[in-house]
Amino acid sequence: MTAKPHLPVVPIEDVPASLPTNTSKKHRPIVLVVDDESAIADTLAEILTLSGYAAMPAYDGEEALETALLMPPELLITDVMLPGMSGIELAISIRRIFPDCKVLLFSGQAATSDLLASAKRAGHQFTLLTKPVYPTDLLKRVSESLEVSQPAHRS
């Protein structure tokens, strides 16, 4: 008998029929989604892709950096707790290379607040989503993050 892992992603039947989408017909913002649980990274990337974003999953910090160098992201969405390089370390590294990249962190871990406080003391401010990540919350935060960074795309 094998145990099924519990993934902190909302069941598809709980996803509203109408989700916020990227309304720009010309511009598909590149979003890099990172989680060591491939089902979560893949699901979030798929939600974003279906909503009009060019989303790519990665499963650890090193892979995310390699992917970012090939396709510079406008937004990084990463789990805080990754093996090896933490999501916060990844976010700082990505911003060193791509200073205009926006960052959304997500976590279901209580220890995250200590890591965020440490990053803030070092001058890094990040937005945090908590697991489970609901599609409507994800898309709202993505839209808000990209609106701030791209005022020229507003109608």
Language-model segments: residues:
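Charged docking surfaces used in two-component/phosphorelay signaling
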Residues: 42-50
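The feature encodes the CheY-like receiver
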Residues: 41, 83
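Alpha4 helix (beta4-alpha4-beta5 surface) of REC/receiver domains from two-component response regulators
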Residues: 89, 102, 110-130, 136-144
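Short hydrophobic/Thr-rich beta-strand motif most characteristic of the beta2 strand and flanking loop
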Residues: 52-59, 67, 129
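Active-site beta3 strand of CheY-like receiver
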Residues: 71-77, 82
